[in-house]
Amino acid sequence: MNLSKTLKHVYQEAKVSDLFPVTHLNSPSIFESQSGLVGSVIKVNGAAFEIEEADTLNHQRFLLHQALVSLDSRFIIYVTTHRQKISCPLIGEFKQGFAKDLDERYQQRFQDKNLYKNTLYITVVLKGDDSSKTGSWLQWAKSLSIKGNSELSEHHREQNIQTLNRVVEQLQANLNPFGATILGKQDEALGFSELLQFLGLVVNAGQTTSFKHPVYSPPIANSIPQTFKQEAKYPEGHLGQYLSSCQLLFGECIQFQGNTQQDCLFGAMLSLKKYPTNTASILLDSMLSLDCEFIATHTFAPIGRDSALDTISKKRSKLLSAEDKALSQTTALSDLEDGIASETLLLGAHHHTVMLLAPNKSLLDAAILEATKRYGSAGIVVVKETLGQEPAFWSQLPCNQHFITRASLITSQNFVDFCPLHNTQTGFSNENFLGGAVTLLETPSKTPVYFNYHARGSKTNPSKGHAAIFGGNNAGKTTLVNFLDAQIGRFGGRSFFIDRDESSKIYILASGNSSYIKIEPSNPIAMNPLQLPDTSENRSFLKSWFATLVQEESERVIPSHIAEIINDCIDYSFEQLAPEFRTLSHLSQFLPVDFPRWPHLKRWLKRNDSRIDGEFHWLFDNQHDSLNLDFDKVGFDVTYLMDQVHSVIATPVYLYLLHRMRQCLDGRLTSFIIAEAWQLFASPFWEKALREWLPTIRKKNGHFIFDTQSPKTITDSPIKHIVLDNLATLIAFPNPLADRETYMEHLKLREAQFEAIKENTPESRIFLYKQDHEAFLCKLDLSGLSQYIRVLSANTQSVKLLDDIMQEVGHDPELWLPVFYERSKK
């Protein structure tokens, strides 16, 4: 082919700008087409639907219909759903070790799988009054070059822009429950044009680009950076020449060809051919979990009231002339007629396409089959466009309604059912003081969910972050709790564990810079609270602590005369005794012989000439205090305290541990993780401690995480209101025996959320994650990470294996972890 023929083919090739209707922006939020149509775009977060009951969905439908029914035949409405693959990087850094390795492997899973985000847009185009005499006259005036007519046309254009602005701002206000914002309003803060980004979606296969353009290129410049120093968000010239960044090839499928062979995507156009018998707002929800990228477009062009009534009249006449006895049809027509006459309904032309996108043709074919199947299950017939492929493609763009070939008249209620603004929710990643999410979870719809313990709040002050995790044995609670603790390490915090059955021992010790203490007689720990430094806070604590040592089982407060003796004794020990002499046995020598609680105190004392070792002497009657909390993670196994001793024995231990933990609150993010909390909620000590700590500890950047089998352990507790009112996060694993009253009345779950807990199986590993009014069905997918799971959740056998390995190679996790990974596989 010679050069002249090549040039001829180039000139004959259709330009994107010839078919791209939008030519320029009138303002950051208003675009205009070649034919003078003006439009604006509203971005919508959407409404949750996956675990919402019918009443909620119906109310959302009502709100949306009320918002749209205010538009008349001067407008065309486009609802666009853009489903796009995304990556979700998380901020924060891990120290070297187990948590860093786990995070790298876990994040790799998200890079290797398809995760999607659905973004919804409503485009409102003002096409003007093209049916009236005024509209026809203005069209005629535009064709004349008379100065007066041009001025009149310009005046009419300005009026259209004002009308559009007013209508779109009102629509945005009405759609506030759906999280609506007008594109272009935040351009200055973002540094690019949101509206241009949206307008470029279709011609760029859904690939979003933050377009920037140099204002000018001076003929002489000192350097290249100076040449491009100034940038504009809004280009000059035809937008169609500016927005397209790839070559469009139409054939068996649509090919979006970039500058390299690998930079290529394939698309297919599906169009709605046959409508379902009935519509509902859940009609096309299954498309929001389709495993491919797509752009779905619904167009609705209301017709005038008189035209609509005339159309209904003609339809009724046809039924009567055909002697069609279908009473339901004539009744429906009468209802429709009433709705249109009273302006509570609209009748309009509807058109729907979906452009499926894939990196190769085989994946595209699979997407076509799956999408067709999902439409079919909703009673809808769609066809893959062949001859009509190119018109269907260009019809997705606002102001290209002349390319629509498969429009049908439907009501505004039907239109709302086709595009109810449903969307999968993703949580938040940067809306509290941490500046990022703890981790990323996955929904059954293959959309990501940002997990946070803390509620939305100030960027400078800690928000509440207490959490309750409910699940039966083997539900996966321990694995999840420890995984989340490893992930929150990205913020450099610390954790204290009140553990049971050593279930978190392996994880804590694997984390490095950690300590794990099993509190039981066979593993005595040398604690001596009397060795605390002499401060008013410590003196006050020791007086309360000593009182618990001699408390009766049924006693909440000791008698005042006994308290006075104890207080004097504590003061004397600090004022008269050197630290090395402040032991429980030594202090007891200063108590009067007739001290009424000697029998209670002796059980805590070591032997001397006049007594044998008390049963619990190993706990506190020690020469030195070896309790060291200067670690990133500290675990206490308190199974012995939970199962084998009365609460009057456990209380002094808990009291001292919590006092020392409280003194560690230095502003670092601190997690208190309570395993099998159901046993602690029954304790008078914990009732008092939590009543005091839960409302206030956030001020020191602390939060509690309660792991328990049933919500009833909280709802039956005397402090249920303190706990529930201060919870920021709730996680519930499936429970076939879930009690409706407990979950719905006390935990404030909705019907659909409760049913999800009751109907899913524990084997599914799906759980409900709830924060405030948002709820998500999530799954922690650790498949392929079995060696990490064996660390995150321990059992008797694996703990014994760990103990044996540490005896062999030492306590450094860098030494014992590889050995544990290998041996625990067996």
Which residue stretches match the model-derived regions?
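Extended, folded cores of ATP/NTP-driven motor/assembly subunits in large transport
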Residues: 1-416, 420-426
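P-loop NTPase motor domains
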Residues: 47, 54-73, 286-289, 380-381, ...
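Pre-Walker A adenine-sensing motif
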Residues: 447-460
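Glycine-rich phosphate-binding P-loop
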Residues: 460-484
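Walker A/P-loop NTP-binding active-site region of P-loop NTPases
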Residues: 478-528
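A short helix-turn-beta junction within AAA+ P-loop NTPase domains corresponding to the substrate/partner-engaging
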Residues: 513-514, 719-732
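Conserved AAA+ ATPase "SRH/arginine-finger" region at the nucleotide-binding site
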Residues: 518-521, 729-738
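Conserved P-loop NTPase
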Residues: 750-803
